[in-house]
Amino acid sequence: MNLYNLVRDALRPSYATVSPSVDEPTVDNNFVALSCYATLSVLLYYLQRVKQPYLSMLFHILFCLSQVCMVIWLIFSANFYVSLFAQCMLVVCALGCFLERTILSIKLRSMAPFMSMADNFAIIKTTCNNYVFPVERSSDNLVVLTTSRGIYSNGVFMKGAITVSDNALVVSLFKSHSLLLDRVEHGYDYTVFIYINSVILQNIKPTVSVVNTEFTDVEL
């Protein structure tokens, strides 16, 4: 009897029990990628403003690469409208950057805007020629060093004449202003000219310990 039951159970078709399916939570890969891109872009945007020039250049290159990768990813998107928008955005940005550099080049009469991504440029006149230097961070501080080999401006060297006029013209895309240079040091074969904004040398908020108000303003 037991053998009969075993054979019968073996020949009987077995029906699999279907358990109620539970939907696993899915993560949208596009949302994760866009979140990482936004976080990385904001982080690199502020990191490229560090004072160390090599680190600033490195972060600036990484920031540009991240933007290029995002645009390429959007161009090859499966959505036709997203891809078309990315391609149009790429063309508009390229034309805008080229137009900005071209206008600066015409105003400066120099090809310096195509060699540097600076927003401000200083025109320094010498006895023989005019020299264009990029002003990376601020036009409020400008140091000019002339030697027998050439001229330095904020760390950028160019071969040229020694004698420099007492002013420099700082040109940007929408405005330009003249800076009066002061000769602070003179040696055998070098001269140092410097310009510092008067606001930097002024105590706007005097401390409590200052009693006499005559000493709140500091002049160069």
From Swiss-Prot:
Keywords: Host membrane, Membrane, Transmembrane, Transmembrane helix. One of its GO terms (cellular component) is host cell membrane. Its main location: host cell. Residues 120-200 form the CoV 3a-like viroporin CD domain. It comes from Bat coronavirus HKU9. Signal peptide: none annotated. InterPro entries: a/bCoV_VIROPORIN_3A-like_CD, a/bCoV_VIROPORIN_3A-like_TM. It is a multi-pass membrane protein. Residues 17-116 form the CoV 3a-like viroporin TM domain. The chain crosses the membrane at residues 27-47, 56-76, 80-100. It is found in: Host membrane. This is Non-structural protein 3.
